[in-house]
Amino acid sequence: MLNLQPYENPQYFVYLIIALLPVIIGMFKGFRMHWYESIFSLVFLVLIFDADKWPQGKALLGYVVFNLLLVYAYFKYRTREGSKNSTAVFYLSVALGIAHVAVVKFTPLFQHHGSILGFLGISYLTFRVVGTIMEIRDGSIKDLNMWKFIQFLLFFPTISSGPIDRYRRFVKDYDRVPDPEHYAQLVTKAIHYLMLGFLYKFILGYIFGTLWLPSVEHMAMASRGGAFLGLSWPVVGVMYAYSGYLFFDFAGYSLFAVAISYLMGIETPMNFNKPWSHITSRLLNRWQLSLSFWFRDYIYMRFVFFMMKHKWIKSRVWTAFVGYLVLFLIMGIWHGETWYYIVYGLFHAMLINLTDAWLRFKKKHKDFFPHNRATHYPSPFSMTANAVCFSFLIFSGFLDKLWFH
């Protein structure tokens, strides 16, 4: 049976655009065919998880049923008359929401094969489930339509790797039909993003990831015996080649996901906004935006508020420091259970905390450090970009291969 992985090759887009034609025509005529969109999404989900991927399909089905019941039960509890909004019930609901992905992430620590609960996109579905539970807790979601929640949870264009959307924002788009003029603008943007995505993923991503990266990795492994910790100039080449591959491959995928969403009348948030910014904190706020904002809103802000409420740390500076440390440690663990993902997260926390410390120091000693381009931030491809590229070298796992294999 035909198996199609999201945005894997140009042939995939031929099937996708043909299937989307009724949706596009309907939008231009001023109506949305929810029934067709549901069938279309179901067919493409089946094509992702059929054949040898069927075990993942069964895991996805079990995950969806479990979490639909979880979210529905928590919503009913939270909105019933006289609800005490128990913190214990909330924590239990969040814990159950992340239980599947936690099992999948940590199973390789105890056995040589992955968990039977794993499937493509489990992390991104978990973000949607947990984010919805937290917004129900806050009272932001006062009306939860389970059919619309299913559409949100299984929204096909973004199911495998985001961008991460929010239930309330998604439903606003899902419930309305954009006027023809606005939809024409969405289609124009979608075409632009598709073309740019092809350039990024299938051309530049191929150059960095297929043509250059294996060559410099081979040179780095061959020269590791004559250098301290195996570090040599070819390792620098690996750092830049992998950083280029990671950016263009993932940015290309994200552009595809946003473009297809636009064609369906859903304005999924962008994942990148001029990411090679001057300051580390700005770069991280422009790189994989939806993930950064999710962690900021649902982990960092809540953890900082919790520390301040319970007066764990009196200093706001140290509160922010600990908040960033916890945030990026969790983000590192989310990527995987290996040491280099954890170090990657802690390294990013260090970069942001050092940047903030420098800006505070400069402000305190402004007579000696005037506010100008030289003191406010390094140039885009000097200190900041090199530090971030080094973090991607850590993230790649190549140092683990270089040192331990």
Curated annotation (Swiss-Prot):
Intramembrane segments: 146-175, 275-310
Any GO molecular function: acyltransferase activity
EC numbers on record: 2.3.1.-
Topology versus the membrane: Multi-pass membrane protein
Transmembrane segments: 10-29, 34-49, 54-80, 87-111, 122-138, 180-223, 233-264, 316-335, 339-372, 379-399
This protein's pathway: Cell wall biogenesis; lipoteichoic acid biosynthesis
Keyword Ligase: no
Cytoplasmic side: 30-33, 81-86, 139-145, 176-179, 265-274, 311-315, 373-378
Function: O-acyltransferase that catalyzes D-alanylation of both teichoic acid and lipoteichoic acid (LTA). D-alanylation of LTA plays an important role in modulating the properties of the cell wall in Gram-positive bacteria, influencing the net charge of the cell wall. Catalyzes D-alanylation from DltC carrier protein.
A biological-process GO annotation: lipoteichoic acid biosynthetic process
Active site residues according to the UniProt entry: H335
Alphabetic keyword roster: Acyltransferase, Cell membrane, Membrane, Transferase, Transmembrane, Transmembrane helix
Topology feature Extracellular, residues: 1-9, 50-53, 112-121, 224-232, 336-338, 400-405
Organism in which the protein naturally occurs: Lacticaseibacillus rhamnosus
Name this protein carries in UniProt: Teichoic acid D-alanyltransferase
Keyword rRNA processing: no
Family designation: Belongs to the membrane-bound acyltransferase family.
